[in-house]
Amino acid sequence: MQPEVEPLISPNLGAPGSHRETGSFLVDLESMEESMSRSLGKPAKSSKQYLRQVISEYEALDRELPCIRKFSEPPSAQPLCLCMETSEDFTHVEVLQALEAELPGAMESGRVNSIRYENMNVICGTAGRRDRWLITVTDFQTRSRLLRSGLTLRGTAYPLVRHDDLLLGDYRLHLRRSLVRRRMLEALGAEPADED
């Protein structure tokens, strides 16, 4: 009686894709690549499929959000800064008058520190973005009141939002695009630059 001999099959290679033929192993290379990829923590797709996926993800993000604000560092918190987004061309005088209508003597009493205009099309290098008016107040009570009331300019009501919330949203989009760009460059075999 002969002792039973175990076949030389690795647990990873004993998949349905491996075949035993005349004493030698023929291994399905795709299943071996998948199992090796899983064990290395890499995607289980071939490099061409992975590259196509990364490029299509980048292109989709580019179509969805063609103009993303770039940041060299995370934005600092500005809890007393409010923002009004608009496509209308307002002047500083109009915004000040709207503030005075809501808070009489806002500038003279010192409750409003500054009114600043941000042209988002210039910042992002594109067209079609709404501009931002940044209103910095001196206390949280004034901030809360303006957040509730908003501003009325040329008969249209405009809500005010916390500028920190908008900046955080812009920063998240920047990080998302940077990650997709880095993945695309790595898939192409290029070194990602610190341009983003």
Curated annotation (Swiss-Prot):
<dbReference type="Pfam" id="PF15876">
    <property type="entry name" value="DUF4732"/>
</dbReference>
<protein>
    <recommendedName>
        <fullName>Putative uncharacterized protein C19orf81 homolog</fullName>
    </recommendedName>
</protein>
<feature type="region of interest" description="Disordered">
    <location>
        <begin position="1"/>
        <end position="21"/>
    </location>
</feature>
<dbReference type="InterPro" id="IPR031746">
    <property type="entry name" value="DUF4732"/>
</dbReference>
